[in-house]
Every structure is written in structure tokens, then in C-alpha cells.
Amino acid sequence: MHTRRVLGLLICSIILLPITAPTVVAEWDDDNWLRNIIGPERLELGDEFGCHGFEGVDVREELWVIEECRDYLNRFTDASRCGSQPISFGHPNGPVTENVANTISEAGFSIIGDRIEGDTYGLHAVQRLTSLEKGQANISALEDAEQDSLVSIYWIARWYDVNIREDKGAISLLRSQDVWFTTWGEWHGHKESGESFENILINDSNMKTFRISTSEQTSWEVPGTAFFEWSEAPLNIQFDGQDAPIIPSDQKHLLTGIRPVEGGAFVTVAPGVSVDFIFESENVSVTHTPQSTFNGLHHSVSVVGHHVTNLHDWTSDFHNSPLRFTWLIERPASLEVDWRLPVFAVAVLIATPIAIKWVIARDQEDNEQWWN
């Protein structure tokens, strides 16, 4: 009986060891989907790549991950079609300390989110409105979004070992709305560009020329939109001497061109490009109003992928979606199993048949003694 108890304990140890053995973070892994197939596809569609740090590391305690995450991302992809350097950073929920904010800014980031409290020390803060997780989406909040606002929607594909499903009802609602699908960086850059139109003086009284002035404070070049009005409709509108393309009224992704409407036109142009309004009469009055939202749409929407350690998993449900994403990339941890586990496994592998043989021999000996 005693020997059977020993054997039982040995078998229990074999079962429990994989569960109780600790794991040790030895190195950091790479997500090669950032540069292979998926990353380039998402970049071409207009998505943005930002940073979230390193998996399992609190950026508020380990400031080194801010710059290291930027460098990790730069090894694999550009941040956007509008600029190579990442400018969006995912900060843990709650207040931001001045030290953390300064480190984020010095690393080249200018936007943080998305549940920030208090002062951001010069960084642009984006606040989360709701989640895209199935059963968690606030449909009323999506329906009641303010005009010209940026609606930021949280998305995570996996929580530990649990796969998260998207809310298809929320996605259907977004597709039906009069909204611009964009990203954090694109939205802020577009807004700043729209506020930077300047009237360029020329020696032609039948023409008015405007241009977005480029800023030295940003590493991105994002087109901006303004609504132009005039006392007389122009004969033609040109970009750098070429007829400006027409943007359809239902266009929900950023393009350059014009969208004529009654009384004026929405003009979206890249920084540095001249916009020429050609009139039949001389000295026509032209005014412009900056637009936060592209193409005269009601408001803007960006879905934000948080803690993205595997781009394949995070994008798998959105291959043909019109939604645009801000992917906050997190360098994944590479887990190394405790060295004691394989050593113990080998020992058990050797000891188990010996123990079984010994138990059988002991039982046979006991049986012989009983019959005698």
C-alpha cells in the first residue's frame, strides 16, 4: 500500500509540474507580420502604426521602453503614408507624469491616448469613446457623436488566451454613417494643415492662389481641408497648374481634390501644393474656413488596436473592412521555460518504469508471502 501511494504521488507530480513551473522572460520577440504581407497591406490602405511599449512592462516605471518601442517599429515599417516616424503612443489609463510626457515627446511622439486624466504637458490627448468588442460597444454613443469630433474606438483581439470577437452591429452602424475613417495621426495632421492655408500674392487679378504652409514641428505631411467661398464662381480650380480632381460626396478615406457644393467647395490638398482659383472677373472675393473633418463629412472615426503583439491576430477580422486603424504596437515577450522542467521531465522518464517494475516485483513478493 505504501509503495502504491509513492507511485501515485509521483504521477501527480508529473501532472502538476507543467502547471506550477514558473516561466522566465528571457528575450524579446519580433512580430514579422509588420513587414511581411499584412503590415504593407495595412499601410497602403491608410492605417497608422504607433507604439504601446513592451509586453508586460509599465512605461511609467520603465521609461526606456518608449524609445526602444519606436526603434523596434522603425525596423519593420513606416508609421503611415504621411510620414515614416511614429507619432502616436498608447499610455496606461490615468494621469500622465511630466517626466513620462517629456520622454514621450523627446522620442518624437505628439499624440497619446486613450483614457488620459489631467495635464498632458503639450501632448495631444485622444479619449476613448467606446469599444468594438462584441457586447461592449456603446451604440448610443456612436449614434450621438458630435459633429467634427474624432471618435476613438478601442479594439483588442486577444486577452491572455481568450480571443475577442468584434461587434458586427457596431461595425454595420459605422459603415452606414456619414463619417470619415481615419487614424489618430492623420486626423491631427489634417486638422493642423486645414488651419494653415495662406493666401499667396500673385500678379494676376483674375486668379486667387492659396497654399498650406509646411510646419517644421511635424515629421508628417498630411493633406488639409478648407471650405472655400467666393463672390463669383470660379471658371476652374487647379492644383499646381493641373485641373483639380473631383472627390465624390461619399468618399470616406482621405484623398486630395475638390468637392463642389452649393455656395463653394471643400478643397483638400497636400502641404506645399498651390491651389489656383481662376475667375472671369477681376478681384473676386475668396474666403476659406478650416475643416476638422475631411470632405464635409459629419465626424471622424478611428479604431485603435491596443497592445498589438501579433498583427495577424489583430487584423484577421478586418481584411475587407472600410474601417481604418491606429495600431499601437507592443513588442512581444519571448517566454523561456524554467530550466528545472526539462531536467525533472527526464528524471521522471527514467524513474517511472523503474518505479513500476519495483512495485510489480514488490506485489509479487507480497503475494508469495501471503500464499505461504
Annotated model-derived regions:
Residues 1-27, 338-372:
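Secretory targeting signatures
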Residues 79, 106-107, 169-171, 275, ...:
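N-terminal membrane-targeting/anchoring modules of bacterial envelope and secretion proteins
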Residues 134-144:
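A short, acidic, amphipathic alpha-helical segment used as a generic capping/interface helix at domain edges
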Residues 208-360:
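C-terminal beta-sandwich/jelly-roll accessory domains of carbohydrate-active enzymes
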